[in-house]
């Protein structure tokens, strides 16, 4: 009843609430009992994974990051984590350049330096910032961008103020 479907694979959004409420580390895993490549077409998608924000590339670095809660789950095109970690990931992936400002309007060039796709909602208009792509977006400086494929809880998404990008 509480499961959601992402390309025919289930995930449980209520678990995100427990992570936030109890300060738990967000972890992505699978319960496959068969061949991985038969469950996830590895040429088209990957299974659930945990992105770890380690300070160093070592077993101890990964362990320290996980115990400190510095992780984000990637499941299909969905990213799940704390607001702080999702914001860190988005800031690491996307760079912004304000091209021109006229009053409260601006033209912003957004470059996605990652392979992740970001679904956004801006001024009630949906759009996608594809991986390894650059787009120009007209915005109002008092707008907020909602990243609709991010999950902090089952009903909470990452939202960034446009003004904070300047």
Regions found by a protein language model. Give the residues of each.
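Charged catalytic cores and adjacent phosphate/nucleic-acid-binding surfaces used
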Residues: 1-166
């Amino acid at each position: 009843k509480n499961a959601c479907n992402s390309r025919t694979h289930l995930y449980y959004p209520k678990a995100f609430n427990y992570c936030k409420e109890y300060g738990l580390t967000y972890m992505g895993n699978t319960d496959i009992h068969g061949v991985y490549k038969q469950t996830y077409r590895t040429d088209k998608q990957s299974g659930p994974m945990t992105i770890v924000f380690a300070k160093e590339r070592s077993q101890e670095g990964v362990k320290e990051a996980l115990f400190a809660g510095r992780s984000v789950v990637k499941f299909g095109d969905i990213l799940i984590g704390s607001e702080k970690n999702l914001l860190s990931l988005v800031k690491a992936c996307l760079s912004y350049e304000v091209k021109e400002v006229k009053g409260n309007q601006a033209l912003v060039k957004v470059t996605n330096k990652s392979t992740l796709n970001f679904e956004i909602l801006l001024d009630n208009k949906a759009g996608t910032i594809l991986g390894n792509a650059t787009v120009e977006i007209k915005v109002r400086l008092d707008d907020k961008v909602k990243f609709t494929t991010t999950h902090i809880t089952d009903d909470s998404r990452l939202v960034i103020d446009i003004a904070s990008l300047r």
